[in-house]
């Protein structure tokens, strides 16, 4: 607060100094406007007329002193909130004693099931014995070939020159996998080939039947 008082005093002194300067200035101006007349001895005959006195110049009133600024009240420091008192912890109740687990009684022994007698195995029907090959009357005499001939093409190449000769006993041949029959002369048809693609040749039927029913695999076909 003391610096505010010092500022006010300085302002008042400055105002007084300004007033004094203004007063001196005014007096100087008046002095120039109305100089003092020279002293002349009064004449004897005319009476001395006194000079009119000039009206006094009004003195300007001094300016009102500036009021000191209102001091800004200090911002009040916020009061810290009271520290909350921690709640008193509730005592934890003692744990209830765990009742002892009852010992499980052993399960009763299972009664073994009575074994069911297995049914007797069904008798396997006997495999029918294939009929013997027919007489060579309808087919003629068989032609044997070496065991190294294992394809139909190789068998055809082996039989073709044989069928071209005069061999009355070599009239037909069957491949090793029973998938056909090759005739040199089948009822006047030269070099006739009967192919069994998805089944097998049968001597009894003289045609193609199911492989499991064919009698062809029971006979050696490539013995020379």
From Swiss-Prot:
Pfam families reported for this sequence: DUF5478
Superkingdom of the organism of origin: Viruses
Biased composition (Pro residues): 44-139
Location of the region described as Disordered in the Swiss-Prot/TrEMBL record: 44-145
Alphabetical list of InterPro entries matching this protein: DUF5478
Name by which UniProt lists this protein: Uncharacterized 24.1 kDa protein in LEF4-P33 intergenic region
Organism this protein belongs to: Autographa californica nuclear polyhedrosis virus (AcMNPV)
